């Protein structure tokens, strides 16, 4: 007995020593890097059969979660591009919107111009020179290596409005863009650029048709002026795959979605629609500093209200980031902090919680279910929205408070589980189990501005 115990003790000591050595060795090894998700391995982006959402050729849904980096091509160098795109990837974005040209010509941080002979791009690639389009190539390929699409606003609306690109030049420019980028997997074309579609319509049609005649493999939309939608002018165009509206930087309530989003979803032919420029975080409300600034709560409200009302995606924006503001540049629209500091604002950090929620449920088989909210009579500034599928319903309550819900028309199950999701940190909190035979009231854990909540019934 004594011998056996001695052997076991010795063996145990050797085992502990071996485990300790293995642990020491393992901590000295480099950590396994998380594999980058490359969405286009699922095939090209296409419009879903019912015309409401975007998906890949193999059927995998695509949830557009965009970031706004309008002046990245002009203001960031290669190292800064890498830093910015890494932050975008870590924050959960899978798309970044940029202005390919913000002027005619445009100049980038390296002092290189976008064109040297008008819209004749024949000799644009010069040996030994890292030109404007070489830098654009770098941005696109850098984004691709991180699984990020680039939303290419080909030319901003202002120079077109000023007559700096006509129809003939639009055809030449579209041909150049399409031939250069048709084989890149991570391109989404965006015609327009903060402009009404009835302003130089013939130029926008020429640009779109020129690109589409060469590149039939990438989706295309139109980026409109604030508080307008592409559907007003282009919904019947073959080149327009999905609609985009800009709820803009002045509206503060649900009325803008009723006028633009809900109206677009009723148009024929049916096309997906998304808010490509909602309230930017930290931008002065209606561009006037005396009105205060939009904050993380304003951002979350636009995200959840638009997505739960039937949008196919959402683009976040920040006042300092879109312009890549730093002490090298004069601030626009009263920019305050640098673009690098602003990447970590609260609203930007909240985006990934919504993406994880979408990925945890079968979001794109859902639909708006507003009729499930029975009371109270809602005002547009505190408008709760409902969205759900076969196995779940989501309710977004901007100011918390209480709503009366009736699930009897949604499910045959006698009981459902209710949980709260805190959209500020992604925390899931059990609420209660409840019978579905009749309407019931739910009261959020906290109430008031900045105390928005998502209720899940499943």
Language-model segments: residues:
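Residue-level detector of flexible, active-site-proximal loop/helix-junction positions
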Residues: 196, 218, 227, 271-274, ...
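Short beta-strand segments
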Residues: 190-192, 221-224, 244, 274-277, ...
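Short strand-edge motifs at loop-to-beta-strand transitions and within beta-strands
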Residues: 440-441
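Bacterial Sec-dependent N-terminal signal peptides
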Residues: 1-33
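Aromatic- and carboxylate-lined catalytic core of secreted/periplasmic carbohydrate-active enzymes
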Residues: 60, 272, 281-283, 297-432, ...
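Active-site mouth of glycoside hydrolases
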Residues: 35-254
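Helix C-cap/helix->beta junction micro-motif
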Residues: 27, 146, 214, 268-269, ...
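Catalytic-core region of carbohydrate-active enzymes that cleave or remodel glycosidic bonds
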Residues: 237-325
């Amino acid at each position: 007995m004594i011998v056996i115990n001695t052997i076991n003790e010795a063996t145990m000591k050797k085992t502990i020593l071996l485990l300790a050595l293995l642990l020491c060795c393992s901590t000295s090894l480099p950590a396994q890097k998380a594999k980058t998700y490359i969405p286009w391995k699922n095939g090209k982006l296409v419009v879903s059969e019912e015309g409401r959402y975007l998906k890949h050729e193999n059927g995998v849904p695509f949830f557009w979660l965009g970031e706004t980096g309008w002046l990245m091509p002009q203001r960031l160098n290669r190292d800064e591009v890498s830093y910015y795109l890494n932050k975008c990837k870590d924050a959960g974005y899978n798309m970044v919107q940029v202005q390919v040209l913000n002027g005619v010509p445009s100049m980038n941080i390296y002092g290189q111009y976008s064109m040297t002979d008008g819209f004749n791009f024949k000799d644009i690639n010069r040996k030994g020179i890292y030109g404007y389009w070489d830098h654009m190539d770098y941005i696109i390929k850098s984004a691709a290596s991180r699984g990020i699409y680039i939303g290419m606003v080909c030319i901003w609306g202002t120079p077109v409005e000023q007559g700096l690109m006509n129809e003939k030049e639009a055809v030449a420019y579209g041909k150049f863009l399409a031939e250069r980028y048709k084989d890149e997997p991570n391109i989404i074309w965006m015609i327009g650029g903060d402009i009404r579609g009835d302003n130089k319509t013939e130029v926008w049609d020429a640009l779109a048709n020129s690109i589409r005649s060469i590149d039939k493999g990438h989706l295309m939309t139109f980026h409109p002026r604030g508080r307008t939608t592409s559907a007003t002018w282009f919904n019947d165009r073959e080149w327009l795959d999905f609609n985009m509206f800009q709820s803009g930087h002045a509206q503060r309530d649900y009325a803008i979605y009723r006028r633009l989003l809900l109206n677009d979803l009723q148009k024929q032919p049916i096309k997906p629609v998304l808010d490509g420029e909602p309230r930017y975080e930290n931008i002065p409300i209606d561009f006037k500093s005396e009105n205060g600034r939009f904050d993380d709560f304003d951002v979350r409200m636009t995200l959840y209200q638009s997505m739960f009302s039937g949008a196919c995606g959402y683009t976040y924006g920040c006042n300092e980031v879109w312009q890549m503001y730093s002490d090298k540049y004069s601030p626009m629209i009263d920019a305050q902090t640098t673009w690098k500091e602003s990447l970590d604002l609260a609203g930007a950090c909240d985006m990934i919680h919504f993406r994880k929620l979408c990925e945890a449920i079968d979001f794109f088989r859902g639909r708006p279910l507003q009729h499930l909210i029975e009371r109270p009579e809602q005002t547009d500034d505190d408008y709760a929205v409902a969205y759900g599928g076969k196995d779940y319903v989501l309710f977004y309550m901007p100011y918390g408070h209480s709503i009366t819900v009736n699930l009897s028309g949604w499910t045959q199950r006698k009981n459902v589980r209710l949980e709260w999701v805190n959209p500020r940190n992604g925390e899931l909190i059990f609420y209660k189990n409840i019978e579905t035979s009749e309407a019931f009231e739910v009261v959020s854990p906290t109430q008031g501005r900045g105390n928005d909540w998502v209720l899940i019934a499943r």
